Amino acid sequence: MGDSNLTDGSEGPFLKYALFCRGTAETEGGELTLNGIVDLLDLPEPEKSSASENPVLATVDYNLAFCIGGADPGEHYLFVTLKTPGIPLETPPAQKVEWEEGILFQRWIKTFRIPVQKPGIHAAAILFDGIPLGEATFLVRFSDDAKPLEST
């Protein structure tokens, strides 16, 4: 009970995994390595005067690595959007993807430049043909021990 079985005949697409990381590498054999998995970002407390000048505290470049399985062969639409505290971010258009017969899983790595405006949960929501499959998240918090990030 409670265990998921990838061969249980469940219908429809599902999110196998999704996470933020700093880098990726793939071998010739197709093995994927995720480097610097990000689940927490510590930032120094901003100065009170600078908060009103620029709402962006830091900008981070992270990879979103995710894998979808269980889709029927044919044309589909993949939609990934960032949800962050603060001013809403521009939403990218959906991406058309072709799912071929016999494919069990497809994985994607998308690079995002994320403007951090406030502490809290930063998420990437993943939708496939308009169906929410899940999300990857990381938490931003203020810490006295944090070193300032260089905005890029």
Model region roles, listed by residue range:
Residues G2-F128, P132-T152:
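Contiguous segments within soluble domain cores/interaction surfaces
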